[in-house]
């Protein structure tokens, strides 16, 4: 329902997106900064994530405690996260408190104090976060996996950074990074719920008046490389991650062809991997596949965990299923995958948090709003031949593999 969607651009370049859902009593606010870990220069690894942490640590007019108290006083939820290509500051509040929440978010992205004592304290917190990731087998194997996929590139490096890089950051580093990237051209303010677009535009003009226009940030093109990595670790199970060059955001038709492929291959209980690897052979409890798109690249990932002595058999069976996937797709498989996408899309439309994130992501990635109806039109036009062609394109690329457990994989 595009009639509920509105977009405006402020004089300084800030994009304002709203989706009105008059039947709810709340709003979800997303302030998306189109800058993540892949925008970091050598020596800056981890600064985008560290900067997101500092949002909670005080501004020129609010202490960290005051920020927490103000959000609690309006019964709001506030948090943030950093990805490879974006940083998101988000909140969920009652509609009557939208402007108050927006004022706090505007303050932290424009006026963070970056006090050295707070930086020192947060450094210790992030060190613990890094240590936790190193102790988590799933986090560890995926880190090694991406190191191989995008070797020596920002996309292949951990979002958290390393203890060596983050210990060098001081106030000047944060001011330089925000000065370069935290500008109106890189921000998208998206709000969904019981919201008045014109009121939000008026409030945003006031609250973000000190945000300079700046320039859109750039990054180096990603290049899929691939390779194999092994982590020798004594665990209850061995985990195998396989990857191929997937599909980027560039082409919507290709993107949804790949999504259908991922669902048919390993996206549900009726998927080929689930039925063959788990139900028929009993080789794995968790097995599946998905595509991770980026602006200019993508990674098609297959994952499974198995008993240590079944690793070679698991790899062989996955190889066979990959070959089969590139040869034939049944119409009933396509119909089931289409229904999964349609159901998930329609149910998600009822959630203000999803809708706010959706419209913001649409504009940050595609420069336009893509309605569920448009997505389903694309999905319904995809044929079996398209999925087979997509499977052949993806699975003909160089394989990437990562194993964590006591035994390595002899080859793939």
Curated annotation (Swiss-Prot):
- Keyword Protease on entry: yes
Q: Which Pfam families match?
A: Peptidase_M16, Peptidase_M16_C
Q: How is the cofactor bound?
A: Divalent metal cations. Binds Zn(2+).
Q: Which UniProt keywords apply?
A: Hydrolase, Metal-binding, Metalloprotease, Protease, Zinc
Per its UniProt record, what PROSITE patterns does this chain match?
INSULINASE (PS00143)
Q: GO molecular function of the protein, one example? A: metalloendopeptidase activity
What name appears for this protein in its UniProt entry?
Answer: Uncharacterized zinc protease RBE_0522
